[in-house]
């Protein structure tokens, strides 16, 4: 073992703004996993999912549903974050979110994307509708075991 060479360990040094962002994301995880949030979102989706269809054309009603969703869900999250972080600013966090989007965990980023990306919002409703109607992707029938032994093949 050579003692002349020092091992160089990369240590991630985060700025206060990174630490603040990470704290907000941690709180967000707690909020969206909470039963109250799940209930609010599920109730909203249950109320509106039948309006959505998989056509290329977006109906005018989608806009009002989207705006209602943003108002309801974003307001709920912002209130919960303000309880945990006095002086929290959702607008500043949204801008910070764009800078950190490559670092975000998938589910949280996808959910937050539904506030700003209409197509993500519509896709969420289409997935929910497919699930409600039993059209969700079922991979359980994807694996079939077939014997390669000729003697197990019955003759017709």
UniProtKB/Swiss-Prot annotation:
<dbReference type="GO" id="GO:0042531">
    <property type="term" value="P:positive regulation of tyrosine phosphorylation of STAT protein"/>
</dbReference>
<comment type="similarity">
    <text>Belongs to the ARL2BP family.</text>
</comment>
<dbReference type="GO" id="GO:0051457">
    <property type="term" value="P:maintenance of protein location in nucleus"/>
</dbReference>
<keyword id="KW-0539">Nucleus</keyword>
<dbReference type="InterPro" id="IPR042541">
    <property type="entry name" value="BART_sf"/>
</dbReference>
<dbReference type="GO" id="GO:0005758">
    <property type="term" value="C:mitochondrial intermembrane space"/>
</dbReference>
<dbReference type="InterPro" id="IPR038849">
    <property type="entry name" value="ARL2BP"/>
</dbReference>
<keyword id="KW-0963">Cytoplasm</keyword>
<protein>
    <recommendedName>
        <fullName>ADP-ribosylation factor-like protein 2-binding protein</fullName>
    </recommendedName>
</protein>
<dbReference type="InterPro" id="IPR023379">
    <property type="entry name" value="BART_dom"/>
</dbReference>
<keyword id="KW-0206">Cytoskeleton</keyword>
<comment type="function">
    <text>Plays a role as an effector of the ADP-ribosylation factor-like protein 2, ARL2.</text>
</comment>
<keyword id="KW-0496">Mitochondrion</keyword>
<dbReference type="GO" id="GO:0005813">
    <property type="term" value="C:centrosome"/>
</dbReference>
<keyword id="KW-0966">Cell projection</keyword>
<dbReference type="Pfam" id="PF11527">
    <property type="entry name" value="ARL2_Bind_BART"/>
</dbReference>
<dbReference type="GO" id="GO:0005634">
    <property type="term" value="C:nucleus"/>
</dbReference>
<dbReference type="GO" id="GO:0005929">
    <property type="term" value="C:cilium"/>
</dbReference>
<dbReference type="GO" id="GO:0003713">
    <property type="term" value="F:transcription coactivator activity"/>
</dbReference>
<keyword id="KW-0969">Cilium</keyword>
<dbReference type="GO" id="GO:0005819">
    <property type="term" value="C:spindle"/>
</dbReference>
